[in-house]
Structure formats: C-alpha cells, structure tokens
Curated annotation (Swiss-Prot):
UniProt keywords, alphabetically: Aminoacyl-tRNA synthetase, ATP-binding, Cytoplasm, Ligase, Nucleotide-binding, Protein biosynthesis
Classification via NCBIfam families: leuS_bact (TIGR00396)
Gene transcribed to yield this protein: leuS
Name of the molecule in the record: Leucine--tRNA ligase
InterPro entries, A to Z: aa-tRNA-synth_Ia, Leu-tRNA-ligase, Leu_tRNA-synth_edit, M/V/L/I-tRNA-synth_anticd-bd, Methionyl/Leucyl_tRNA_Synth, Rossmann-like_a/b/a_fold, tRNAsynth_Ia_anticodon-bd, Val/Leu/Ile-tRNA-synth_edit
Organism: Dehalococcoides mccartyi (strain ATCC BAA-2100 / JCM 16839 / KCTC 5957 / BAV1)
SUPFAM superfamilies on file: Anticodon-binding domain of a subclass of class I aminoacyl-tRNA synthetases, Nucleotidylyl transferase, ValRS/IleRS/LeuRS editing domain
Amino acid sequence: MAEKYNPQETEKKWQDKWAADRLYHASEDSPKPKWYSLTMFPYTSGNLHIGHWYAEVPADCFARYKRLRGFNVMRPVGFDSFGLPAENAAIKHNIHPRIWTLNNVENMRRQLKTIGAMFDWDREVITCLPEYYKWTQWFFLKLYEAGLAYRAKAPVNWCPSCQAVLANEQVVDGTCWRCETPTTRRDLEQWFFRITNYADELKDHEGLDWPEKITAMQRNWVGKSYGAEVSFALDCPTAFEKEIKVFTTRPDTIYGVTFMVLAPEHPLVEKITTPENKAAVDAYIKKSRTCTEIERLSTEREKDGVFTGTYVTNRVNGQKVPVWIGDYVLQSYGTGAVMGVPAHDERDFVFAQKYHLPVITVIAPSAYDGKPLEAAYINEGVMLNSGPFNGTPNTEGKEKVCDYLAEHGWGKKTVNYKLRDWLISRQRYWGAPIPMVYCEKCGIVPVPEKDLPVLLPEDVGFRSGGESPLKYNEGFVNTICPVCGGKAKRETDTMDTFMCSSWYFLRYTSPGYDKGPFDPVKLKYWMPVDLYTGGAEHAVMHLFYSRFFTKALRDMGIIDFGEPFKKLFNQGIIVSNHQKMSKSKGNVVTPDNLVAEVGTDAVRAYLMFVGPWDQGGEWNDSGLSGMSRWLNRVWNLFTEEYTPQTASAEAERELKRTLHQTIKKITMDIERLRFNTVVAALMELSNSLAKLKETAAISAENWQNTLQTFALMLAPVAPHIAEELWANLGMKYSIHNQNWPTWDEELAKDEVITLIIQVNGKLRERLEMPAGISEAEAKETALNSERVKPHLLGKTPVTVIYVPGKLVNIVVK
C-alpha cells in the first residue's frame, strides 16, 4: 500500500473503474425494492459552483446509503438547457445558442463526474436536443386536445431588460426573477395552460412528505377564497351589457356599497366612460400600465382612481352607485370589479375619504351609538341599514344574503382563486417551438404528431426588441396547413423552459425510448420519485408546474399517478463571510480548484460537515484543510501496521460498544438527512479507534472487522477513499455493492451512565452509575448523595422524578 494518500490519483482511478463497469447503472430487472433519487437538474450556465455541489453531494450520500441498505437505486442526471441566458450569450458574443449550450454541457458533465456521484450516465437527458423536445411538443398537443392549452389576448408581464414575457410566478416583488429589472404590462396574444382547473388539487398535499413552508407557499399561491358573485344593474346607452358582476368575500356588507371600482383593463371601461370623462380615464389607464401588480397591490401605496361618469344600481336597495376605475383592482382576480364598502374595508375607507364618497355603516357592535365612523369597522357585529337583515349577526348574514341574492337571480355563492393560468409562450428563439400553425381557411391547427419534432432552424438572426427571431425566418414560418394543404404560417413563439423541466423526471425512466415520451412499463416501475432535492425557490414555479403536469397526464390516461415526488427536501445555501456567494462580491468558491488541491472526498465530507443540510453554512478554507487532514489520518489508521499484543477483554468490549453505538447513530442520522452529525460521528469513531490501536489490545480479527465496518460507513460520505481502503483490506470489489452494517442493541448499551441529580430543577450532583440501574436504586442513591443531602435539610420531598438512564429530580418544599 502507498505510504501517503494521493486523493487525485485514487479518485480518478476509481471514477474510471466505476464508469467502465457501469457500476451505477440501474436496471428494472433487479429483485431489490426500487429507490428513485433525484436532485433538480442544473441549468447549463457554464460552470458548476459550490452551490451545485451542496445540492448534489448529501443527496448522493443518501443514495449510496440506500444502495448499501439493499435498494435498487436510480440516480439520473441531465441538463436543463433551453432558456434566455443562451440567447443573450448569442447576442453578446456572436455565438449560436446551441453551440454555447452544448459547450457548457460538455464542461458541466466533466465537472459533475468529479463529484464522484453514483450518477447513471446512461440516462442523461439534455432538454434542448430534438429527441427530447419532440416529446415536449407532443405533450403540448395532448394538453391542447384535452382543452388545457388555449390562446388568448391578455395583459402579460414584460421584462424590458430580457425583452421577454414572464409568467406571474416569474415576477418577484415587481421585478424579473432572473435579472431583477422592474416589469411592466403589455397586451399580447399568448398561449396558456389551464392550471386553474387543478387549483384545489394543487393546494392539497395529502400523503406527501414535503416541508411545511413549501406546501404553505403553494396553498397561498392558489389563494382560495369563498364568497359571492353579485351583479349590479347597468343602464348605459353605449354598452350592450346590462350588468356588471363583482366578486366579494363580504356579501353581508352589500347594503353598504357606495361605489364600484373596475380594473383599468376591464373590457367595459371603454364602453361605459362618458365623453366628458374620457380624457381623464385614458390618462389614468396609461399611467397604470407603468405600474407592476406588486406596486398596484401594495398596502403602502396611496389608492387612487378616476370616475367614469356612469352609475350602476345596487339591486338589493335600489341605490345608484358611481363606477370608478382604480389600479388597485386587478382584472386577473375575480371579475376585475369590486364593490366599495368604505364602512367595513380599510382600503375602501381611504378611497372614499379621498374622493368624498358616502360611508354607510351596515355592521356594528351591539353598543354602536350611530355616530359616523372614524375608521373602517372590520370586526364581527350586527347588521343594520340592511333591510330585512337588520339585527342579524353578520356571521349568519353572509349565508342569508347569498341565499337572498340567489333567489332573486342577482348573485350566487362562488369560490375564487388568486391562481392564474400558466402563461407558457415566449417571444424568444432558444426554446421548444410551439407545434401550431395558422391557416387563413382553417384557423389554428395543431401540427400532426407524425411531423414532430418541429425543429428550430439553425440560421436565425438575433435582435433585441421583444419579437421572436423565428418571426423573421421565412423558411421556418411559411409552411403547409395539415388540414387543407394550403399556405399557413407557424407559431413563432417558443415554450417557457419550465415546460421542459415539468416532465424530465419521467423521461429519466427510459431516455432512449422512441415510441413515446417514456416506456410505460419502466415508468410504472420507477415512478414516483422517492426523494427529490433542490432549492426552495422553486416552490411556485418548477414544483408547482410539475405537479400540474403530472395531474393533467393522469387525467388524460397517460400515467396512473397524480403526484411526481413522494418526499421533498430543500437544502440551505453555503455563504462566505455571511454573504451569499456571487461573482460581484468576489466570494465565489470554484469546486475545480478545490478538487485539484485536496481531492473530491475532502470537499464532499466538508460540505456535509459544514452545517445542517436544510440550513447551509459558512464556507471556511481552514475547515476544508482540516477535513483533508482527517481523511489522511483515516488513511494512516488503515495503512499503518497493526501488531496486536495480548488481547484485552475490556478493550474488546469498549471497541464493540463504540462501534455499535456509532453504527446506530450514523444509521439514524442518515435516515434523518443529518449529514453533519454523520461526519462528526465518523470523526469521533476514528479518534476512538486510533486510541484503541495504540493499546494493541484488540485481536487482529476484530481489528480487521472493525476497519471493514468503518470503511462501509465512510463509503457514502467519501466513496473513493473508502473503495481504496476496502480493496487494500483484501475485500471483494466493490464496497458499494456490499451491505450496510447493523448494530446489536445490547452491544450498543453503555456499561456506565452519568446520572444527573437535581433538586427543584437545579443541578446538585453528577454520578457515574451502572447502565442497568433500576428506578428504585437510582432514587435511593440520589436521596443519599452527600452533595444532595444539604439541599434536603429542613424540607420535605414531595415527589422524586426519574428519567431512565438520565436524571433524578427531587421536588421539595
């Protein structure tokens, strides 16, 4: 054996060996229970950073552990490779997005292999390749056939920097999720998916082992509200419509309506605005288009509006109500119209005060004196000024008013959602083309399945301005209508890249299958994913879309399950000097340099040790150096000659106890994904073994068995050095095909425990006692302790509490 450990040489040797042997190839023919381990695949930005490693390494440790526990583990890998950065790079560097992307794939593939993960490279997927996006287009057609894909003109989020449309989920605090530029609104013909059809299912996480923060974010994003849809009579000579509908969660306040507010985008605004108010309304609409939805909804921003000149009639009391427009109302929520009840809504109260609109109290506490309100009353109370409902508790009034409205045909109970349909079309080149054509005779026509994929053309000119480069490629645009054979034009928008990542986990089950998006037999074997790991930032984008996609495919009969991921785990982040790593701060840690310096296993072990996986930790170069030194000590523990002297029964017992306690702890901690304490336990064990080795009181056989067990527990954390040590022990290749060690509960028990003695909860004594001490013996020992007796003088013990093996608490008075 080598005297000095050379991590780079050893790691390359075993990585090459594992690859040549296809050691980590997962087969559906295995008699073992399956385990599908998946980490969110990386975007092809060009280089892996330490955050990628932090996502992959602990997940790989757990996958390796499951393999040793007898599971047939699949851990696939791939690349999310469509998207805006590639197109921006094409414009900036005058390079084709395909070339830029595939160069990045090649580099990142090399980097991923240095992690030493048990990736099954036979299952690699790259979403920008035609053999993948052919099936992305196929899914679009299936969604279209099912009525879940549609085209409509709608106000959309626009990023002026990216020159692209954004889905609602991609706007964060009024800014673009990618570049943080403030977004604006535009009216465009767009393609949408009816994700709202699945609103109730998407807020239900029954049976899933997901973090509560993620399920809460998804429930809040769906935003389910119970209320009523109420129609107000409209008598306007310039409008064909005879009513305006509003959604309200407070039907009990219907008698207090003193104004109505429409969203600036409401289709009736233009029709009902009187000539004398048109200039002011037009100016207000123009101004509102410069505001983001976040700004419009902000509670800090002053609410304003403009009068249209038109009135509606509140049918429950015959009152004429002025119709205003205000940008704090969104067309995308409810009906795009709200009833103003200033007496019982804080926002409406401020609006009414500003524009001198009436305030009518219709809910009041029992002691209400009839004086004008100085602020909106939003608590429960009794209905007044409410016709037949006077004296009714408003909690009952909600239901009664709904029934009353329904009886007269003026309204109905309804449920509303904050969730909007998924906007999936993008005016960019580097994405999967939407497989639709436009024929003057036949209208919108889907591309036949036999003609898929609709390929991206290679010869395109990239330009800014917000229009797809495909629009100017005549060879792509001009085509033949599949129905009538006449001239037609292709859709030039491409799909949101989240479309590609909404099903990639299905493709991993059979990536080479060409008769469909996946082999149904293999899909049934592997799905759903048993453990999915990745960042919490994907809660209302990727994770949300993937769940919708899975449920839609289930309803179409393509798959037979409704949830893609059984268990979800979100890792924390690695910071440097208490700051998130970024190029601008100059604190980015490059894994390539670290591997060259200390080797992969040291980086792996340090990342797992740096802090709880769900919290992350502070990067420290000295900590990494310390981890490297520890692995060298482990190497020396195995490779330096051991010559036993006379075996000691006491030393043998101590060895077995320490070993079995460590097996138990590491097993339980890995199951809980607590990798930092796993590494700490391995360190403690190596220190204990080093001390026992010095005594030379362990038999050669027991020492050999102990080293084998240690290597097995080290294998998920540091797979390369563990494989090398295993081979050096003369064991059968590969360590990663062995069985995880088990512990004996009896052997793991301590012979001696430290018993804490308290009096009224205060520590008074620590005693070393036999591990098997009985409750009676523990209590008697505590009461008779010389250091405890002074605290009992003149006092009467009320009770003595015993926590087995840990403490005795004497309660006195």
